[in-house]
């Protein structure tokens, strides 16, 4: 059977209650589907009307159809019953029988009370004694069948550039508040790992709003530009220490000559080598980061290959709110994960100074520079998710 492309839409109320990380962790870990895209989505009334029309047309129990349509109409619009932002997190998955697996095995039925599904853990369904619905919160939505799936995918493609992408202006703050937007990149994660969800759950303690998200396969060219400032830092910070070079020289001289080489000669050459090798060492350490973040060896890649997406998967997020940069970096912890306080993200999930769970911008101007490099600055230009959907639908005809 051919692979199917489908979606999961995390609801505005789930984002409001900071359930995003828990739901995302389930979506990533409870199925063998491949995540192929992610974006934020704040639907217009026009989208909501058309989405409800797809629900009306699908074949399912009339009572459940009515419940879902009422929910979407009441909660997805900019003016909604909870008077909250209608931010949603939209994820795309691909794989064999993706539609059924996501709907039945991961998200679960409307009335699910079992904790092994998303709705069982994060959703609510309360009936009155007469069988009518008193309260319903599905936590996440997905398509019910292949026909409805294709209709809804086409709808997302149509409105992707209008209602999706970077949605900084959707969140409103009290007058006088000066919000910042900072970039976070969750570093390469394995398939079926709940790690990105776990980290997002910890970031939720900041009280900041997610206003952008992107599944990132960083190219070597992007990584080289993104981390470029580190080369100058590494040149001096990681410069080979003369005393260590001297130690190696003495060992080599001792094994080669039957006489002792004067200390003045050893020390003189050690100082020279330290200066001569600092550029080479800085680039070598820099390339380790590039390979880790892209999954590709920059020393072996051709110029053409350096522009292609890497094999390593990262998740880039935009957090917005007052003092966003400080709040994110505080809960993240220091670059060296072993030096962080207990309870910090890098202390819990980091391995070393490079594999330290996540990157976070250290200043507003750097956040702007970094966002532009990975195309998470605005909604202009090419829309990869729209192309992904359109290519799939064309092949499905």
Residues covered by each model-derived region:
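Non-catalytic terminal and connector segments of soluble metabolic enzymes
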Residues: 1-397
